[in-house]
Regions:
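Flexible glycine-rich, low-complexity coil/linker segments exposed to the extracellular/periplasmic environment
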Residues: 253-282, 373-406, 479, 483-485, ...
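Extended hydrophobic secondary-structure segments that form protein cores and membrane-embedded regions
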Residues: 180, 239, 347-351, 437-445, ...
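Short, solvent-exposed loop/turn and secondary-structure capping segments
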Residues: 104-105, 117-118, 359, 449-452, ...
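Flexible loop and strand-edge segments within Gram-negative outer membrane beta-barrel domains
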Residues: 247-249, 279-281, 289-313, 317-324, ...
């Protein structure tokens, strides 16, 4: 009887573990009315970035899924569908057409189309579908929302992200997608100078259609961003966001007492080097962050016929590493008047941003795991700016240095001014309303100033102490394009012909000062000698 009870308990435990274990979900997605497979359907674990697309036969395989997860199926022109994962990990999903989505206008390259007429792999994300919360950089609005688009970031406040569409994998060339904002291709994928609150929609071009429109620049896909425009109704909106950040978990390392014990057992000759403090270096280099954002926007018509939107953003973002910070001030303007019964339309967009950020060396987290927990953060008698440092006969060693001192004494800042804008004019010919002539001109200009400073009291492994350096860079991107677009329906046949010309120029320059300190002012009293200092983690084998 006892053996039977134990066996029953074992079966129940096994069932429980299986229920919560991650599984692989397989299935097929079909069109409900015809039963035909649907290729390119986005399959996403809701609330995560774990997603795939169906293949040409409508099949998909999605790993790391557990019971209770919700799978979100999305396809242009079809109603979204959610499926809750239970015990069945082999799915047969039917999607039905949505007349509302079929008529939705999406931006593709130099023009627009409806979902039902789109032929390439295009995915459109509007404001209602974007990621919510305290979003600092624009690309995070679509993080986890588009299958095949992978966005990773370093975690530093305001840091740029690495964006990959369908896993670009060139060894030598860039794998970054092309970013187009209101018709203007911009340089790089750094979007931290854009106010996320200004963005109205994203269109992601994933296949050869991107190359057909933008040439080799679109080889890694294209992300088209459309910003919010003015309207006839007057409105004034204010949005305030505050966010609190904390890193709850810590790496389990020896505290001061355990460290003294292990040194006494393994390195008794080094006992005299230990201190009397009990310092948790992880707590010292990590901080609880408070971040705030202010967004003010005004909409309405100027002079009764120019729909206008003006927005201002102020962001102060703290990082969770000591000294890490990101500040941004942003102003954007959009004007969209029309004339001659909407035959002539003008769209003007302009964005201006000031960014000031201080970088914190993330490597000091590793230093916090290795540094001696028996030593204090500060030492009033220390010649190194009042911070404790390991010395032997007055000499700083080549081992790990005080991570708090490294963060506070080394100040690396970056100040950037960026402005970009675009003017587009569309004219629908009166004598041939099926044809529209368009011309646009835009620019993207960036000026960056980076500085590095550390005092003479910073320990060094060379005979050069301290740092005072500066680097500047400037870039200018200019773009002009003109198109003629003819659209007409002949019965069931729709004709859409586009011809155009595009001109783009890039200019960049930069300079760096190197260390500007006078070599004769360098102190050499504390030159280093090679000594290895080790902080043993608890996983160190006994």
């Amino acid at each position: 009887m006892k053996k039977f009870k134990l066996l029953l308990i074992g079966i129940l435990l096994s069932s429980t573990f299986t229920m919560f274990a991650q599984q692989t979900v397989k299935g097929i997605v079909k069109e409900q009315s015809s039963g035909e497979p649907l290729p390119g359907v986005s399959v996403l674990v809701k609330g995560t970035s774990n997603g795939v697309q169906t293949d040409f036969d409508g099949n998909f395989t999605l790993e790391k899924v557990k019971a209770g997860d919700i799978l979100l199926f999305q396809y242009l022109g079809y109603a979204d569908k959610e499926v809750v994962i239970g015990t069945n990990f082999n799915l047969n999903v039917l999607l039905s057409e949505s007349s509302e989505q079929l008529d939705e206008i999406i931006v593709v390259g130099y023009g627009t189309t409806t979902v039902k007429d789109a032929t390439g792999s295009v995915e459109s994300i509007t404001a209602k579908d974007m990621t919510k919360g305290n979003i600092v950089t624009a690309e995070n609005l679509i993080s986890g929302r588009v299958a095949g688009v992978n966005i990773t970031t370093s975690g530093a406040p305001g840091s740029g992200s690495q964006i990959r569409i369908r896993g670009g994998s060139s060894l030598n060339a860039s794998n970054d997608p092309l970013i187009v904002i209101d018709g203007l291709p911009i340089q790089g994928v750094d979007l931290n100078s854009i106010n996320p609150n200004d963005i109205d929609s994203f269109s992601v071009l994933k296949d050869a259609s991107a190359t057909a429109i933008y040439g080799s620049r679109g080889a890694n896909g294209v992300i088209i961003i459309t910003t919010k425009k003015g309207r006839s109704e007057y409105s004034l909106d204010y949005d305030y966001q505050v966010a609190f950040g904390e890193i709850k978990d810590r790496i389990n390392v020896f505290d001061a007492n355990a460290f003294r014990d292990i040194i006494g057992q393994r390195r008794p000759s080094d006992i005299g080097l230990l201190g009397n403090a009990n310092t948790n270096w992880q707590d010292e280099v990590l901080q609880n962050s408070v971040s705030t954002q202010h967004n003010i926007s005004a909409r309405g018509e100027i002079f009764g016929f120019i729909p206008t939107r003006l927005s201002v953003n102020f962001s102060e973002i703290e990082g969770n590493i000591l000294t890490s910070e990101f500040d941004r001030a942003n102003v954007s303007l959009a004007m969209s008047p029309s004339f001659f019964d909407d035959h002539l339309k003008v769209n003007l967009t302009y964005n201006r941003a000031f960014v000031n950020e201080r970088y914190a060396d993330a490597g000091q987290i590793n230093a916090a795991l290795r540094y001696d927990p028996t030593q204090p953060v500060y030492d009033a008698s220390s010649p190194f700016g009042g911070f404790y440092q390991h010395t032997v006969n007055g000499v700083v060693q080549n081992g790990t240095q005080n991570p708090v001192a490294s963060l506070l004494q080394n100040e690396n800042r970056n100040n950037r001014f960026r402005q970009f804008g675009n003017l587009k004019i569309d004219y629908k010919l009166h004598f041939l309303p099926e044809m529209t002539a368009s011309i646009s001109a835009g620019f993207d200009k960036s000026e960056t100033n980076g500085t590095g400073f550390s005092p003479l009291t910073v320990p060094s492994t060379t005979n050069v102490f301290g740092n005072d350096s500066e680097g500047t860079s400037e870039s200018l991107n200019e773009n002009i394009n003109a198109t003629l677009n003819y659209v007409n329906n002949f019965g069931k046949l729709k004709t859409d012909i586009l011809v155009g010309y595009d001109y783009q120029s890039f200019e960049s320059s930069g300079k760096s000062s190197g260390n500007r300190r006078d070599p004769n002012s360098f102190a050499t009293t504390f030159a280093s000698t090679p000594v290895v200092l080790v902080h043993f983690p608890k996983s160190w084998p006994h």
